[in-house]
Amino acid sequence: MDIKKISGVLRAIGGSQRDKSYTSAIIAAAGLSRRFGGEVTKQMTELCGVPLLVHTLKAYEQADCIHEIVIVTREDEIPFWEKLCADHGISKVSRIVKGGETRQESVLNGLEATSPESRFVAIGDGARCLITPEQITEVCHAAYKYHAATAAHRATDTVKLANKRGFIESTTDRDTVWLAGTPQVFKTSLYRAAAYTALDKGIQATDDNALVEALGHRVRLVECGAQNIKITTKEDIAVAEGVLAHRAKMRAEAIADGNEV
């Protein structure tokens, strides 16, 4: 039995499987944080002593399904994030590029900076710092099967549709209502077609799912819980710090009990 030959075959199989699912994370962090306020952008705001965006990046760094990370940020912040990634051991970052005038343009800039190997793109909000590596992986695996999948959470409150004057028009069946979050993961070729079709037609959407939907493609919903919030106001910081503190406590207790986490 030729061990070297068998090892070579196994490596080739592993490489082939990786090529089919090579996933590039595009982290959108170029916003001006107008609703957040303050002198620094929310991505730079410290959360448990660490800039908010670092928490987000660590989740994608630790997700086995993610092969590279492209950060899209403000041009003047690029050196800052280069240093932070080095300081915090975030090694999957391949490029840090400047954003565009809109979120769609920023994500498109990130798309063009991904590796030629990229087969899937996982588009994430830099401000969703409570996403976990396990949730990222679950959404990615759904996308590998359906070519499009998104983190989401079922609505638990009664949902009302209102008119422009602030009066209820109708009540929606909440069993069919989901709140979309990120990551939103797509086959790279599919998302590229969706993004450039939207650009050509002047379509502006509030999330990347809508661009893919506009092509007539279905997007699989993956329940990721209510904690996957997007930090929007300073009040959200307190909520996020509470969640992170609780997770740290649970991790410490598990380690003390001899359970690896």
What are these regions (language model features)?
Residues 105-120:
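Active-site nucleotide-sugar/metal-binding loop of Leloir-type enzymes
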Residues 46, 130, 185, 230-231:
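Short aromatic/basic micro-patch
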Residues 130-222, 259-261:
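Conserved core of the sugar-phosphate nucleotidyltransferase
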Residues 1-26, 30, 62, 207-209, ...:
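SAM-dependent methyltransferases
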Residues 79-84:
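Acidic helix N-cap motif at the loop->helix transition within catalytic regions
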Residues 27, 53, 110, 125, ...:
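Residue-level signal for inorganic ion chemistry
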Residues 88-101:
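Conserved donor nucleotide-binding strand/loop of the catalytic core
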Residues 9, 13-78:
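N-terminal glycine-rich phosphate-binding loop and ensuing alpha1 helix
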